[in-house]
Amino acid sequence: MEAAVGDGEGGGGGGGRGKRGRGGGGGEMVEAVWGQTGSTASRIYRVRATGGKDRHSKVYTAKGIRDRRVRLSVATAIQFYDLQDRLGFDQPSKAIEWLINAASPAIDTLPSLDPAAFAAIPHAAADAAPTRRRSQQQQQQLSNKSGCSSTSETSKGSDKEVTVASAPAQAASFTELLIAGVAASSAGGGAIGNGADCVGIAHPGKGGAEGASTYGFSAASSFGDAPPIGMVPAPPFNFSAPGADMAAHYSLAQDQLAAPPPPAGGDYNLNFSMSSGFLGANRGTLQSNSPSNMSGHHHHHHQQQLQRLDGSTISFLLGHAAAAAHPAASEGQITSTAALQLWDGFRHSGMKEKSKN
């Protein structure tokens, strides 16, 4: 059991010894040193730096700082509470004061305490006050720093989240810029080589712009889908009707055609994809596409490519044009009949060379 000491008002008695009262600044309890009546030295030692309640404090004694709460044995606690009930006090401290006043004659016979033991108490209490203030200030500074650090850490975390969240947007915008640049360059290149990348097919039975059929495919629309070999554009074979100002274009670019799947193990792949090779020309630079720059080496290259084609494939591609070929041709232009004859001559010459070899 525990009994609190020094919670009540002063009881007096005992020739002024043990006299207690209120004094000092701030309403703190001041207890006179035993045998020194009216001393204002505070013997209360605050445990908490912020003060707190009186029951959380300790007191200065001749043997050092001690707790204000006293632990009693079971028998002593029973006797004490019985005495408190008989006295009619509602607080244990009042019963303790009554006992001290009643035992004052016996207390006078006891040896007095050494006054030198209490000489350092006022100085210790005075020194403890600045120490408490400094400790309070330090704790406040630490709490402020911890709050600022937590706030700064929170702000740092929020900055990181904003950066991470904005990173995909930046990456997306950069990708869009790249795509826009590629599209612009592809559009510019397509505009330059438009006439060279297309094959014009004319209807001999019609004249003017009506005899031209318009078939076009955009090579930039499927950029990246075609294999590397598909980047080779169509050769510059243009067949136009007489008097036509512009021939319609029919592009056979391989990037618009899907590559055939690979054959199974042990099987032969009989499929083929349409490319510029069927027309017997592989374009180099833009300047080499004009008919005036066709060299002998270019013709030899045509013959090698024509050897890979059989008669059925050629008749399939150009049979309709040969049947409906217009007999009249303007000067300086190659008609469809002349083109077929030239093509057939290339094929026969290639077959003869192959038979000789």
UniProtKB/Swiss-Prot annotation:
Entry's Gene Ontology cellular component terms: nucleus
GTP-binding found in the keyword field: no
Main localization, broad class: nucleus
Comp. bias (Gly residues): 7-16
Polar residues biased stretches: 142-155, 284-295
Cross-referenced Pfam families: TCP (PF03634)
Compartments reported by the entry: Nucleus
Gene Ontology biological process terms from the UniProt entry: regulation of secondary shoot formation
Domain spans labelled TCP: 52-110
Record key words, sorted: Activator, Developmental protein, DNA-binding, Nucleus, Transcription, Transcription regulation
InterPro entries per the UniProt record, alphabetical: TF_TCP_subgr, Transcription_factor_TCP
Subunit structure: Forms homodimers and heterodimers.
Protein purpose: Transcription activator. Binds the promoter core sequence 5'-GGNCC-3'.
Protein name: Transcription factor PCF6
Natural source organism: Oryza sativa subsp. japonica (Rice)
Gene for this chain: PCF6
